[in-house]
Amino acid sequence: MMYHIPGVLSPQDVARFREQLGQAEWVDGRVTTGAQGAQVKNNQQVDTRSTLYAALQNEVLNAVNQHALFFAAALPRTLSTPLFNRYQNNETYGFHVDGAVRSHPQNGWMRTDLSATLFLSDPESYDGGELVVNDTFGQHRVKLPAGDLVLYPSSSLHCVTPVTRGVRVASFMWIQSMIRDDKKRAMLFELDKNIQSLKSRYGESEEILSLLNLYHNLLREWSEI
């Protein structure tokens, strides 16, 4: 399942990020890619050794950790260190698959259940640059407003189409979920959304409490902590 998570960053935050990224040190994006990805990757990434990078990635982590919809959809156990990429002048990233595991500075290793892209450029400011994700339901093309995030299974083949005008800047990361199975995670998300909708419409009730109990018992049964 793919999920659109709106408003992870406010317009003011986006403007500040873009200003700071305009002063960043950019390097060849292939430095963080395996052998397969390096053959089809042509973009730039912020140098992870820079002081600016350390500050920006912490801000992204804080933003996603505080976003209730992101938590409900991803049920994150571990978040990778966010990275930042830039596409311009026909740069692109061909179809590839993300690695199943990644090194993590605190946990040693993490499993990549979900991939996330946080858009930092206004969609009208560049041509091309769509995130294209293939899954069992077909092909999905994603180009979201600045400050919005898309979540999708890391098991999906995906690419970024060439940017033929302007500049596309984004942050991206991977998530190890408490719920490994995509279908179970999707069911919990739907249950959670409906519980919240019923609470806002009718207030607290015994039936809602029973559904909440069901949600937490399923989370307890399925989660890997």
Curated annotation (Swiss-Prot):
Question: According to its UniProt record, what is one Pfam family this protein matches?
Answer: 2OG-FeII_Oxy_3
GO terms, biological process: DNA damage response; intracellular iron ion homeostasis
Which protein is depicted?
A: PKHD-type hydroxylase YbiX
> What are the alphabetically sorted keywords of the record?
Dioxygenase, Iron, Metal-binding, Oxidoreductase, Vitamin C
Q: How is the cofactor bound?
A: Binds 1 Fe(2+) ion per subunit.
Q: Which residues form a coiled coil?
A: none
Q: What is its EC number?
A: 1.14.11.-
Q: Which PROSITE patterns match?
A: FE2OG_OXY
One of the entry's Gene Ontology molecular-function terms is: 2-oxoglutarate-dependent dioxygenase activity
Q: Acyltransferase as a keyword? A: no
Q: Where does Fe cation bind?
A: H96, D98, H158
Q: Which residues bind 2-oxoglutarate?
A: R168
Q: State the species of origin.
A: Shigella dysenteriae serotype 1 (strain Sd197)
The chain positions of domain Fe2OG dioxygenase read: 78-177
Q: List, alphabetically, the InterPro entries matched.
A: Oxoglu/Fe-dep_dioxygenase_dom, PKHD_C, PKHD_hydroxylase, Pro_4_hyd_alph, Pro_4_hyd_alph_FE2OG_OXY
Listed cofactors: Fe(2+); L-ascorbate
Q: Do the record's keywords include Metal-binding?
A: yes
